[in-house]
């Protein structure tokens, strides 16, 4: 029986990825988080160029905070405070 080969890209290489993601955190843990659907500037911090919401592993939000953010972004899109898709991608 042949020994199993390890697939390329598996193993110790993941540590550098986690360090890179840790430096991209958007919110400090000490600050109280409140999302208002009318606050366009604050919501746009959590939306990328394509109009997609940035995931929690990058933003550093808790599950509860990410859920509040999701509802605020969806409501702001519904009321046309922020666009669903950026003008570049239409």
From Swiss-Prot:
<keyword id="KW-0694">RNA-binding</keyword>
<protein>
    <recommendedName>
        <fullName>Small ribosomal subunit protein bS18</fullName>
    </recommendedName>
</protein>
<dbReference type="InterPro" id="IPR001648">
    <property type="entry name" value="Ribosomal_bS18"/>
</dbReference>
<keyword id="KW-0687">Ribonucleoprotein</keyword>
<dbReference type="GO" id="GO:0003735">
    <property type="term" value="F:structural constituent of ribosome"/>
</dbReference>
<dbReference type="Pfam" id="PF01084">
    <property type="entry name" value="Ribosomal_S18"/>
</dbReference>
<keyword id="KW-0699">rRNA-binding</keyword>
<dbReference type="GO" id="GO:0006412">
    <property type="term" value="P:translation"/>
</dbReference>
<keyword id="KW-0689">Ribosomal protein</keyword>
<dbReference type="GO" id="GO:0022627">
    <property type="term" value="C:cytosolic small ribosomal subunit"/>
</dbReference>
<comment type="function">
    <text>Binds as a heterodimer with protein bS6 to the central domain of the 16S rRNA, where it helps stabilize the platform of the 30S subunit.</text>
</comment>
<feature type="region of interest" description="Disordered">
    <location>
        <begin position="1"/>
        <end position="24"/>
    </location>
</feature>
<dbReference type="InterPro" id="IPR036870">
    <property type="entry name" value="Ribosomal_bS18_sf"/>
</dbReference>
<comment type="subunit">
    <text>Part of the 30S ribosomal subunit. Forms a tight heterodimer with protein bS6.</text>
</comment>
<dbReference type="GO" id="GO:0070181">
    <property type="term" value="F:small ribosomal subunit rRNA binding"/>
</dbReference>
<comment type="similarity">
    <text>Belongs to the bacterial ribosomal protein bS18 family.</text>
</comment>
């Amino acid at each position: 029986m042949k020994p199993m080969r390890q697939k390329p890209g598996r193993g110790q290489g993941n540590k550098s990825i986690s360090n890179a993601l840790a430096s991209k955190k958007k919110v400090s843990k000490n600050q109280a988080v409140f999302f208002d659907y009318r606050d366009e500037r604050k919501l746009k911090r959590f939306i990328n160029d394509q109009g997609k919401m940035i995931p929690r592993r990058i933003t550093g939000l808790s599950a509860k905070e990410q859920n509040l953010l999701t509802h605020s972004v969806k409501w702001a899109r519904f009321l046309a405070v922020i666009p669903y898709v950026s003008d570049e991608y239409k």
